[in-house]
Structure formats: structure tokens, C-alpha cells
């Protein structure tokens, strides 16, 4: 079933109190916003605050060009600039939670994007270079999770906002 149809159908079953409202929202790019917040990668969060297109920013890093160059060419209808932005989206979705080349290939296929071997190799590398605090956060999460399993009942922090504890 079409997701929009499914949502429209499910909303028919919600009731609201008189004089109360009901809102529906899309948590746009939620996975790309939560991770930098958890990891303290504030420069990335600031791009959202500034209204920047994170996918174009990623693409500029992948293809060693500028945000302005890709944005200008996209506005002019350049299909290669559209491909570059799509690669930036793939990078965000595939690499944010430690995905590598296999994840890039999977997400690229889902986006209908054909990438060269060099692009597939380069996408995770440029992401990791651009987000050192996120990379450190991955290691902190792994370390805290292992320690929690090894030390039943004790709590271990990963960054400022995540705590691991084994209770079983």
C-alpha cells in the first residue's frame, strides 16, 4: 500500500477532543540530525540551523568542489549536479551509522544511482574524514556496550547523552 494512503486511512481512526488540534509532521532528515547531536558534531547541526542542504554539502566533499558550484549547476538543470547531490544523500544515509562500501552500494541502488568503484570507495572515506566526532562516538558506543556486558549492572556512558547498562 502507498504510504500516503496508509497514513490517510489510519488518520480516520484518530479522534480529537473538541477545541483541540491534531498535527501530522515529517521528521525531515531525522537520522542525519540526531547523530551529530548525540556525537557533539555541532558544525553539522549548524548547517541545518543555517538552512543549508546537507546533501549538497556532502557532495561537495565527495567530488572536491564547492557547495555553490553544485547548487548553481542544479538550478541550471545540470543532471550531473543532481547525481552529485544524490550521492551526498546516499553518503548521509549509508555512512552515518558506520556503513561502508556495501551500505553505499545498497543505498545507491535504492536511489537509482549508478556509482563508479572509485565513488563507492570514496564516499565512506570522505564522510569519516568530515565527521571526526561522530567516528569517535561510534567507538565510544562500542566500548560502553562491551563494558556494560562485561560488568553486569554498571552504567557506562558514550558521549554526553547515551548510557549503556546490562540488566539481564
Regions found by a protein language model. Give the residues of each.
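Conserved catalytic core of nucleotide polymerization and phosphodiester-bond processing enzymes
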Residues: 1-168
Amino acid at each position: 500500500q502507498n504510504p500516503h494512503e496508509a497514513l490517510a486511512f489510519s488518520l480516520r481512526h484518530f479522534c480529537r477532543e473538541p477545541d483541540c488540534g491534531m498535527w501530522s509532521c515529517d521528521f525531515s532528515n531525522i537520522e542525519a540530525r540526531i547523530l551529530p547531536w548525540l556525537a557533539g558534531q555541532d558544525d553539522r547541526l549548524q548547517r541545518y540551523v543555517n538552512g543549508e542542504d546537507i546533501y549538497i554539502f556532502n557532495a561537495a566533499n565527495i567530488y572536491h568542489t564547492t557547495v555553490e558550484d553544485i547548487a548553481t549547476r542544479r538550478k541550471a538543470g545540470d543532471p550531473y549536479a543532481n547525481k552529485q547531490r544524490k550521492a551526498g544523500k546516499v553518503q548521509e544515509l549509508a555512512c552515518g551509522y558506520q556503513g561502508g562500501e556495501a551500505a553505499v552500494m545498497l543505498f545507491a541502488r535504492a536511489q537509482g544511482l549508478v556509482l563508479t568503484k572509485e565513488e563507492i570507495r570514496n564516499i565512506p572515506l570522505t564522510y569519516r574524514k568530515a565527521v571526526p566526532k561522530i567516528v569517535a562516538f561510534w567507538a565510544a558506543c562500542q566500548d560502553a556496550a562491551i563494558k556494560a556486558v562485561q560488568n553486569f549492572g554498571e552504567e557506562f556512558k558514550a558521549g554526553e547523552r547515551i548510557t549503556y547498562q546490562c540488566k539481564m
